[in-house]
C-alpha cells in the first residue's frame, strides 16, 4: 500500500483537471490554452509577469514544469502550490534576484513519459524494470521547449534570449528532465534547479534496491555535463518519496565534486523532515531561486 501511494505521487504530481484557472497574488498571468506542438500533445502554458513588467527593459526567463501546481492551491489536485509568484515577487522587490518572468508548462497524463530522459534509459542495465508501461519522450518534450515554446516567448515578451539568461526548474521527475536539459542543450540553458529529483529512475523498491539503475542517472550527468559549465542546484528531504533518494543523491554529489564542480556552479541542500510535496518545495523555494538568479 505504501509503495502504491508513493508511486502515485509520480503520476499525479502536477496533474489537475479543474476547470477554474489559477489566480496569482503577485504579478499577473497570461494564459495560452492548447499551445500547439508537433512533438507532444498541446497543453496550457502560463506566463507569469512580475509587477511593473514593461517592454522597456529585458527579463531573464525561468521555464518550469507541472504548471498546474505553481500558483494556486485552490485549483491543484492536492490543494498545495509552489507559491512561485509570491517568491519571485519578494526576491525581485528586494533586489536579491534579477528581473525574471516564469513560463509555467502544464503536464499531461503522460507526465512520467515526457519527463523521462531518453538517453539515460540507454545507460540502464539490460532487463531493468524501469518505466515498464511508458516509452521515454523526454527528447520530444525538450524539443517542444527549445524549438517551439522558447522562440514564441522571446518574440512575444521582453526577454534576454541568450543562454546566460535562460533557466529551468522542476521537482521529482521535473528535476530529472531539468538536469537532462542542461546536458542536451548546453547552448540554450545556463542552469537548472532540481528539487527532490527522482534520481532513482524507477518506482521505489526498498525491498529490491538496484544500484545499477540508480547509477544510470549519475553516470549520464557526470559524462555529459561539462564541469562548471552551468549552474546546477539539487536537494532532497527524507520523508515520503524523498526517503528513497538519499543514497543515489549522495553518489551524484560525490561524483560531481570529484569531477571538479565548485560551489559557485553546483549546490546541494538537505532538508530533514521535508516530504515530496509542494508545501515543502515552497518553503525552500527562495534558496534555489537565489542560487540561479542572483
Model-derived features: where do they sit?
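Bacterial Sec-dependent N-terminal signal peptides
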Residues: 1-26
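Non-catalytic cap/lid and distal C-terminal segments of serine-dependent acyl enzymes
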Residues: 18-294
